[in-house]
Structure formats: C-alpha cells, structure tokens
Amino acid sequence: MAKKSTPVDSGRSKGKKASAPRGGGPAVIATNRKARHDYHILDTYECGVVLVGTEVKALREGKASLVDAYATIDAGEVWLRGLHIPEYSRGNFWNHTPRRVRKLLLHRREIDSLTGKVRDGNHTLVPLQLYFVDGRLKCELALARGKQDYDKRQDIKRRTEEREVVRELGRKIKGMKG
C-alpha cells in the first residue's frame, strides 16, 4: 500500500489576502459604514470598477478606504471620486496614484435612470462597499438622500428602544426558565 503524502509548507508568509471565501461568496474589501448613518439609502446598484494592475494588487492586500468617496455622472459616464487605494507595497516607479478618479461600469439604462434622479436634486451617489466577485472588483453604489440631524437623532432613538425591548424580552425569558 502506498503512503499518502502530506502537504509541505513552502515557508512563504501567509499575508492577509482578500480572495473569495471558501463558500464562493464575495470577498468584501472595504465598507462605507458612515454612509448608512448620513444618508437614506433609496436604491443600490452593483457596478464594475476600471482599475490598473497595481490597484488590483493593493486591493488584494485588503487596502482601500471609502471614507470620502462619492460618484458623479459626467457626459453619460459614472466616475468614482475620493476612493483611496494606497500604493502597492511592492510596486515600483510605475505605481498608481492613490486618489485618482476611477470609471464605474453600469448599463446604459441604469446610467440614464441615475442621471435623471441625481439631476432633480437632493440625491447623491455613494459607494457602500467594494468586494471581489469571481476575481473582478465590484462596487455597491447607492442612490441616497442626505439625512438631517433630526433624522439621525430619530434613528438613534429607535435603535435604543429596539435594544431595550430585546433586553426586556431576554430578562423575561430568563426569568421563566429559572
């Protein structure tokens, strides 16, 4: 009977890579948590992002920031501005510019629909998250309307009340068991 061979460790360092998880789902690179706090999300779109080689490598290292990012529509094309992808750590002289404007890929009918809604006013395009699907970077783009301060306070109050209800139910259920 032949012996089963065991895998040998190559000795390479196992750095943090943003590849797809074992389940085959998307590997999330960056999320814009503040967007859901500052905006009412009306609709979301999945769009592709045009990148250069060193940007892809930097994103695979899990580096990106959506903090000040937003999208604009110019001449029938959607552009992502303010996205920060730091330079690739092992890049050379030809490394990319960290805050360059990147083109987003959407269907024509989606762009036309967004153009009409954004032009009417009070709406903006905000990226919610960046993730890889089948090796391609996707951006979840949201059509959003800005919240006023009183809206934010109402949301905080509502979440606090929901937490209190859950806490009380937990206490009552725990008391019934004892």
Swiss-Prot record:
**Keyword Cell wall biogenesis/degradation applies:** no
Signal peptide span per the entry? Answer: none
Q: What does this protein do?
A: Required for rescue of stalled ribosomes mediated by trans-translation. Binds to transfer-messenger RNA (tmRNA), required for stable association of tmRNA with ribosomes. tmRNA and SmpB together mimic tRNA shape, replacing the anticodon stem-loop with SmpB. tmRNA is encoded by the ssrA gene; the 2 termini fold to resemble tRNA(Ala) and it encodes a 'tag peptide', a short internal open reading frame. During trans-translation Ala-aminoacylated tmRNA acts like a tRNA, entering the A-site of stalled ribosomes, displacing the stalled mRNA.
Q: Does the keyword Cytoplasm apply?
A: yes
The family line of this record is: Belongs to the SmpB family.
Coiled-coil residue spans: none
Q: Where in the cell is it found?
A: Cytoplasm
InterPro entries with a match to the protein in the record: SmpB (IPR023620), SsrA-bd_prot (IPR000037), SsrA-bd_prot_CS (IPR020081)
Q: Give the principal location in a single coarse category.
A: cytoplasm
Q: Name one GO biological process term.
A: trans-translation
Q: Where is this region: Disordered?
A: 1-28
Q: What Gene Ontology molecular-function terms does this entry list?
A: RNA binding
Q: Which Gene3D superfamilies match?
A: 2.40.280.10
Which CDD domains did the record assign?
A: SmpB
Keywords in alphabetical order: Cytoplasm, RNA-binding
User: What organism is listed for this UniProt entry?
Assistant: Corynebacterium urealyticum (strain ATCC 43042 / DSM 7109)
Q: What is this protein called?
A: SsrA-binding protein
Q: Name one GO cellular component term.
A: cytosol
